[in-house]
Every structure is written in structure tokens, then in C-alpha cells.
A protein has these predicted regions:
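Short, hydrophobic secondary-structure boundary micro-motifs
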Residues: 22-27, 36-37, 63-64, 109-110
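Generic, well-ordered alpha-helical segments
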Residues: 17, 39-46, 60
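A beta-strand edge to alpha-helix "cap/lid" segment located at domain peripheries
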Residues: 12, 49-129
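Short acidic-aromatic low-complexity motifs
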Residues: 1-31
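Generic alpha-helical structural signal
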Residues: 5-9, 45-48, 52
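A short gly/proline-enriched turn/hairpin at secondary-structure junctions
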Residues: 31-43, 54
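Short amphipathic alpha-helical segments, especially helix-boundary/capping motifs
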Residues: 23-29, 40-41, 71-75, 129
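Alpha-helix boundary/capping and short turn/kink residues
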Residues: 19, 41, 86-89
Length: 129
């Protein structure tokens, strides 16, 4: 599978299903994974806690990939995430992300997020723990 399909399909499985599947996350991301998002840095275990927190705070997450581009081991993504929170409110976040993939695993991400619509309290969903 090429890298951009790896990201697209992996993200659908991680985010667009209701279950928190830590085993799948561990197959997709390297244990050395580092994510820089909105001025914060998450290491692998922080990232797992982040994904678990998202599942606990939300009813559903849908990702609309506007652009996915690949150059070597790098996948650039411009996407919009629509989130239904547990209180039934909707949040939309625009995300620009650069993923680095080696040996079938994501090992690095540099990401910027911007709240498009929704409660300002949800503007940190990209890094919430």
C-alpha cells in the first residue's frame, strides 16, 4: 500500500470507528513516534493517551481529506475533521499535517490545527490528553 493510502485508511480505522483500538495504533505508529502539534510535543505514549481521550470526549469523528500528497517517505495532508462531541455539539477543525513513514510505520508528525466552527474549548482537540 502506498504511503498516502496508508494514512487515509489508517486514519479512517482509528478515528471513524467508535472503538479505541490500541493494538492497531501500535501497528501503525513507531514506538519512537513524535508529534508536534500547535506548539506542543507528544511522544508515543502521550499520543495513545490523546487518542483515548478523543474517543472518550466524542460520539463521532469524520475526516475529509482535501489534499494528500506524497514525496518519498513524507505524506502531506490538508484535511477537515468534523467532530460530534458527547454533548451533541459539532466542532470542525482544519488540519495541516506532515507525516514521515519508514518501514510501514509513522514515526513523526508536524501538525497545525485551526478551529473552523464550534466551541472554543474544543480548539485543542489536536493535542488534548
Amino acid at each position: 500500500m502506498e504511503n498516502k493510502e496508508f494514512i487515509k485508511e489508517g486514519f479512517k480505522r482509528m478515528f471513524e470507528t467508535s472503538a479505541f483500538d490500541e493494538a492497531f495504533i501500535r501497528t501503525m505508529f513507531a514506538s519512537s513516534y513524535i508529534q508536534h502539534v500547535d506548539g506542543k510535543t507528544l511522544v508515543f505514549e502521550d499520543f495513545i493517551r490523546h487518542l483515548k481521550a478523543l474517543k472518550e470526549k466524542t460520539q463521532s469523528i469524520k475526516i475529509h481529506f482535501k489534499t494528500l500528497a506524497t514525496e518519498g517517505e513524507v505524506v502531506f495532508s490538508n484535511h477537515v475533521v468534523t467532530v460530534i462531541m458527547n454533548d451533541h455539539s459539532q466542532t470542525m477543525i482544519h488540519i495541516i499535517a506532515e507525516f514521515h513513514i519508514k518501514e510501514g510505520k509513522v514515526y513523526y508528525c508536524d501538525e497545525l490545527t485551526s478551529l473552523i466552527d464550534g466551541d472554543a474549548q474544543n480548539s485543542d482537540l489536536g493535542s488534548t490528553l
